[in-house]
Amino acid sequence: TGGTARGHRDFLRAALDALGARIIVDGVAVRPGHPMTLAKIGEIPLVGLPGNPLSALVAMVTLVEPMVDAWHGRIERDLAQVVMAEDIPAFHKPLTRLMVGRRELGGFRQVALVSSAMLRGIAHADGWAVIDQEGARKGDAVPWIPVPWRRVTSR
């Protein structure tokens, strides 16, 4: 949808208020993708995706897909693990980073050309390493989320 953050050009919240929506999720502590929104009007769920393409993809994979799976009775599965091929420094904000990268010989590495507004990097990736605020050291095992198209093509 876009418009889910709190900038002067973000109008989703005002529209939801005008419709009498109840906000359930008003952003999450994750990057990219933090301005996700989940609301309800009566019993109708509404999902607000961030406007940046990589952030919107993250919101689909981490919020929308698990929600739809739960509605259909699909059981939540534990995340796979990847071993980090490089040190990832601690982050100055209390949030989780989803690092776009690729599993290679020697471990998981971040791909180049990554920002929430770009899809070029994710096109070369096979998933996200889940990195908490403390960062990760080379050799650490961390949770891993595969990109949707890798799940389909690897079967």
Language-model region placement:
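Flexible glycine/proline-rich
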Residues: 15-155
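Glycine-rich beta-strand-to-loop/alpha-helix junction loops that act as flexible
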Residues: 1-15, 50-51
